[in-house]
Amino acid sequence: MRVSFTAPGHLRDQAVKLIAGAFLLPVALLGSASASEFRTAAVSVARVDWRAAAEQLKAEIGPDSAAASRFNFAPQRRFRSHDPRSLPAIVQLNGATAALFTGISRSPVPVLLPFDTAGYFADRAHGVPSSLSIGHYQSGFRTLDLFDAGPAGYSAQFALEPGKDAAEGLPPRTFTKPVEVQITGSLLTYDINDPEAGKGEPVKALAAQYPDLRRTVREGFVRYAFTKFGVPYVVSIQCLDSKPRAKRLACREASPIAERFIKSLRIVGGKPSRPRGYLASQPAERPATPSPDFTYRPSGAILPGTGYRGQPGHADFTVYSQIRFPLQGAPAYANSQSFLNWGDCFHRGRVPRPTGKGASYRCKSSDKKLVLDETAGENYAYPWQDNFCEARDFNVGQCAQGYGHQGQDIRPASCPQRHGNADRCEPNHFGVVAVRDGVLLRSPKQQAATLLVNTSAEHIRFRYMHMNPSMMDADGVLHGRRVNEGERLGLVSNYQDYPGGTTTHLHFDVQVFTREGWLWVNPYVTLIASYEHLLGQRGREVAAEPVETPAGPPPDDVAKPEEAVEGSE
């Protein structure tokens, strides 16, 4: 059965969701699924107004310009609106820009970039050499670091070099590194329970160009979200919402750059495609054969007393993507690093203060007995434990008080030691692999590597932390590299600002695209499902650990974003 809608975008999306829910309700009532049933994500699909995009391209090129003669703006109404032949100017545009932005015609949404399309074509018409740098047309932003277009939409990253601000009419800044600006336009948006959705302040200077534009600062980025041609777009810059610093970009310095970027956006390509329907949540596939060994605590069941200011965890039973497990082999152990053996208790303090290998202590916020020994057996044992909303200095909208860990920590199979008396694990023994086919997002020296996945049913990012940056640089884990699922990206290490700065583990997190931009979601159940597929066996949920929390008020955690590491480079 096919259902067609011609209502405006938001109303149509809501109608499709209601109808999908009505069809699924009888199934839910007849089944005996528990509240913890693993399910796939629900994803909304935009309806693109390509005729409006073609009209804007015509206005940007200018009807009397030297470049106008190379485009046929007459709509071909004998073709359906989703047929690229219905808009020859868009096809011609793709043919001209494909050499500049590889794969641009794969995007099912209009590609907006800070590129002077009219100036570029006028120069070609007047015989200006094609050898002129593409950066000449990019409004001061250097050649783009990344451009990725696919069935879900597109993402791009540009950078503004230090010292270019004055030349571009921007205020001076304290930050001394290049400012990286990201833009995503997506056909797909994930339907997550986002308490901050729709908030933000309008930007008067850009209201005529983008009437619904909103500016927000959340989850470590200043974000500008807007809708154009029925499509959600988000421009974002990673920044710190505090005073300017030489090594940390302040959001107040990032905002003028983002607004300069948005003012420069022009249509550069993209291709109409057949409309798609709402992707309703479904039960996730899991192996039927039970595992004799693999057990896990429930989603959201963080160690007692380890949440920010005593907050609980965030239960989320969504398998956001059927991924390959990020470590090369099994066994592996998902659990806490800060609040298990050798952990630093998130700076809350250890009591008594341990003085040597094997010394007993506990975190002030918990009665759980620990030892100063990273090699302790509990660290390398089932069951797994969620630590997505464990106390950290990172803004995470999915966590109860807005702060959490952003991802899940995973230890490898074992803890090699340099010698018998060592209380630390030797890093760089266990492989880390790509969880899906995709493209990498990472600048040299950065501590994080992100894998971007763009398919007809997914627009999702996976971030890897604590591998050694020098080794990643040497291995070519850099912007634009395409990798295959299972391809090695590096080795599990302990890098956090410097080698040995944390325990030997992989921090793994998931971001999905929403109308607010890329947001962190709990990866725990996604990892359980991927591990089960690696094993070919189904894990068993066990009760949360009964650990008492010391009497008294919850920990008075004070967020110090300037000290945060995992959410930064």
Which residue stretches match the model-derived regions?
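N-terminal secretory signal peptides that target proteins for export/translocation
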Residues: 1-16
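Bacterial N-terminal signal peptides
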Residues: 19-29
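Short, solvent-exposed recognition patches
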Residues: 37-231
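Surface-exposed amphipathic alpha-helical segments
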Residues: 238-283
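Acidic, glycine-rich catalytic/binding loops that coordinate metals and/or anionic ligands
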Residues: 286-341, 473-487, 498-569
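Short glycine/threonine/proline-enriched tight-turn/helix- or strand-capping micro-motif at secondary-structure
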Residues: 337-431
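Zn2+-dependent peptidoglycan hydrolase active-site motif and core
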Residues: 397, 404-406, 420-422, 426-476, ...
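A structural signal for short beta-strand/turn segments enriched in small hydrophobics and glycine
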Residues: 432-434, 438, 480-492
